[in-house]
Amino acid sequence: MERKLSQRAGNTFKGFTLVEVLITLAIISLVFSLILISFQRATFFTFGAKKEAERLKSEALLFWELQRSLAGAKKLKINQGKELFLITSGGSLYRGVVKKGFIHKDGWLYLYEFPYPSGSIDFYEEEKLVKLAKLDDFKVFALDSLGKHENYEGLPPFVIVELNSKEFTFKVR
């Protein structure tokens, strides 16, 4: 009876089998999983590129800060290859001649700047330290006709700075 009614109405549709429905769902789930995986990888690589760009930016700013400070240096002191103190005209926080220090401790490179070059050149106040960059390795050497020095006071012709296995040589004055 039902068959005759459906034939009269012109209905020739019999429906989907379970296998067809399962195959369709599997194809749709594969497409969505591919889209999700590609989005996840793109996000991961973008985050990695952003982190690398920030690291390179901080290294470039540090390089520029060191170059400016050493180009205007009037007096320089290096302690154990980990601290660099200067009397320089290349201040970044204050104008004019300043007392400046680059101190590496706890995996961070700190900047200390004081507007008046008075007192001991290697004195700094802990609460006035400014974080410059996170560096695993920071070493400073004075280079003169006698070689490289970890401890130095005066004005050498060159200063060598090692940042995370990269070596930079700066001409002083």
Swiss-Prot record:
A single GO cellular-component term on record: membrane
Pfam families from the UniProt entry: N_methyl
Residues that make up the propeptide removed upon maturation: 1-15
SUPFAM superfamilies, alphabetized: Pili subunits (SSF54523)
Signal peptide extent: none
Modified residues (N-methylphenylalanine): 16
Residue runs in coiled coils: none
UniProt entry tagged with the keyword Membrane: yes
Transmembrane region(s): 16-37
Membrane topology qualifier: Single-pass membrane protein
Location(s), subcellular: Membrane
Entry keyword set: Membrane, Methylation, Transmembrane, Transmembrane helix
Keyword Transmembrane annotated: yes
Protein name from the UniProt record: Uncharacterized protein aq_2118
Species this chain originates from: Aquifex aeolicus (strain VF5)
